Amino acid sequence: SEQIVPESYVRQCANPSPYNPHFPYSLQFTVNAMGEAPAAPRDAYWKAGSGGHALCVVPSLDLVVWKLGGRDEQYSEKNTGLPEHSTRDDREGWEKLAEDDGEALKKTLEMVCASVVG
């Protein structure tokens, strides 16, 4: 397979910037080196985008997660023509995600990592 993004760039994304030691951030990515998402591996890093989209990378698990958004009725029946599925809160081990997008993204990353490892 062909590597599109240079390896050095990918490696740097996972390392916090030395220019701002108080915030786990590098090349537009939030870095988990200080445990921002405690249940995810420390080598994880992610970037949230508009509309609730996000990209999460966990090199130690050989894992890349692309989270699709869904705010502002983006996937509503009136916009897609498809019936909406009802939500369920009775699944064992599942919790309602936080309203804050940053916290919800961290929880999503932790749950995906747990399912890969577990």
Predicted features, each with a name:
Residues 48-118:
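Structured C-terminal helix/loop/strand segments within mature extracytoplasmic catalytic/sensor domains
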Residues 1-5:
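Bacterial peptidoglycan biogenesis and beta-lactam-recognition machinery
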Residues 6, 22, 102-105:
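A structural signal for well-ordered alpha-helical scaffolds and beta->alpha junctions
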Residues 14-64:
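Active-site Gly/Thr loop motif
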